[in-house]
């Protein structure tokens, strides 16, 4: 009986210590987790519109990438570069729906910026934190993201 109580207490301590560390969520097989979101790199080239549509079909709530910190960008670079080498991936930032302002396709606030130039759609270089304005009809690789 004493052993059971000790083991139960041990599991409780582990559960409490893991709360708030991201251990309370799980991404589907093949997806990577960061800051309570799931990410997946697809080795497929698509236009911006096709890439966004593709992401929405991969998982409920999934969209092209939206970035909210340089640390998040670094995480994505660490996932994309080994697979895609030096290239571009579409991110969910565009002014496709709004002619005046850029916005994320997942509806989140534009609170982190790292691009130059003006174009309807934005792509991220897989080697660094730089964003580039590109024609939405160009084909680039796809990385999808959703909140876990």
From Swiss-Prot:
Tissue distribution: Expressed by the venom gland.
Pfam families in UniProt: Lectin_C
Family stated for the protein in its record: Belongs to the snaclec family.
Protein name (database record): Snaclec stejaggregin-A subunit beta-1
Annotated GO MF terms: toxin activity
Organism: Trimeresurus stejnegeri
Database matches in SMART domains: CLECT
Subcellular location: Secreted
Principal place of residence: secreted
PANTHER family, A to Z: MANNOSE, PHOSPHOLIPASE, LECTIN RECEPTOR RELATED
